[in-house]
């Protein structure tokens, strides 16, 4: 990343595409909060690749408000052409249980309503697997 320091923080992402197996349970434009744990890495690509990804709707998550690692175009996650593989920097697996993930109720408080925004990634793929039978 562009600062070479370990970050562990709640991160707001915008769902850019719901056409993948991993994002079909979200709404396009929905903002979710999941955990970012990152020291190494950022999304980099040349202008032609970025243009193609954007035109093809293959950017699936984008950082909102704060780009923690200097990723080009604020990209937090992309998908392959088929939409069955998603690469994502933040960690949705750390935001799957109410009261343990990021909370919209503020620092130091426990909210049983917050903290599970990452669960949508896994329920999306589970739903797609069940429907593929």
Regions found by a protein language model. Name each.
Residues 1-133:
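Amide-donor transfer/coupling interface in amidating biosynthetic enzymes
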